[in-house]
């Protein structure tokens, strides 16, 4: 079977060993956002010996110093603030051998117009630094997401989103959206440089490992479960009845990475936008039991008689509790606000269920998939192994 199929069912990967003989690299990747939830998966998967398009040499860019949990990946780490044109040019223009860019980062601002401005500046700085220098640059993967179909957070309830299931041919909504800004910049850049192709990847809510991610739903729920366990309280669902009961889709971070690599090396996938989800359906009420089991905490059914309380409200004074959990369990030193994004979990667990279609990816030859329950367990195991949660 193909590498995509083998990866999708969790077949053992050929890990790159530091004492392997030097390899002549066919492709050179630049991961923008290497410590993010998908960037970390790309940093794990690209260096594997049989990854399509390889052998790969990998550069990874992030704003902060390299974290310990990312340090084992055979990646040349570059600390760079890509919102700063001078820093970006100084750090990235020497990378003349780059053949593929994987854009898996974003920056948040109070308004969507500001998001458009800042994220557009970041992409422009990277393209301006690389395109004149990297003669063999021929593909850019841009990761966006379901907000392409429902609008930015500030527009929720103000504009009419598309009706699920989402398909890639749905028109843009009439609202500012930095996803649209980045797509337009990508297409414009490809039109100016001969041989430069692109792909856009639109995942659902992402299940993956990255303590630094602003939108890490599973990491946040792991912290919530650990606090419930520590305080000997039931694991209550903080969202709505609709989210508890309805069918949902998720996107495993490794699957998204594989999807992007496929699009980067397969000629039939170039210059296209694709949804990217696991290919199955789940209900939060079923995953909630799994989460409770993994942390040995009492599971609580959704109770309609109780007034809903957001995680932002429940967790607002739990900083000292988290410090105690970290100290007692010998965990990696973190602040609660650094490992848990309560507002994002409230958005996901308080909203309507958003389904998409993977038909276009299948029609173009991508058959990867994930079991969402197993994806959840895998992320929890990784959080524990890296001593982020007990």
Swiss-Prot record:
Listed GO MF terms: oxidoreductase activity, acting on the CH-CH group of donors
Positions with a binding annotation for substrate: 147, 179
Enzyme class: oxidoreductase
Catalytic residues (UniProt): 147, 179
One Pfam family this sequence matches: PRISE
Database matches in InterPro entries: NAD(P)-bd_dom_sf (IPR036291), PRISE-like_Rossmann-fold (IPR055222)
Positions annotated to bind NADP(+): 35-37, 63-64, 81-82, 105-106, 143, 179, 213-215
SUPFAM superfamilies referenced in this protein's UniProt entry, alphabetically: NAD(P)-binding Rossmann-fold domains
Record-linked Gene3D superfamilies: NAD(P)-binding Rossmann-like Domain (3.40.50.720)
Keyword NADP: yes
Enzyme nomenclature, EC number: 1.3.1.122
GO terms classed as biological process: monoterpene biosynthetic process
Keywords: NADP, Oxidoreductase
Disulfide pattern: none
Annotated catalysed reactions: (S)-8-oxocitronellyl enol + NADP(+) = (6E)-8-oxogeranial + NADPH + H(+); (S)-8-oxocitronellyl enol + NAD(+) = (6E)-8-oxogeranial + NADH + H(+)
Record family assignment: Belongs to the short-chain dehydrogenases/reductases (SDR) family. Highly divergent.
Protein's job: Iridoid synthase that catalyzes the first step in generation of the iridoid ring scaffold using the linear monoterpene (6E)-8-oxogeranial as substrate. Iridoids comprise a large family of distinctive bicyclic monoterpenes that possess a wide range of pharmacological activities, including anticancer, anti-inflammatory, antifungal and antibacterial activities.
Record protein name field: (S)-8-oxocitronellyl enol synthase CYC2
The organism of origin for this protein: Camptotheca acuminata
Lineage: Eukaryota, Viridiplantae, Streptophyta, Embryophyta, Tracheophyta
Gene this protein is translated from: CYC2
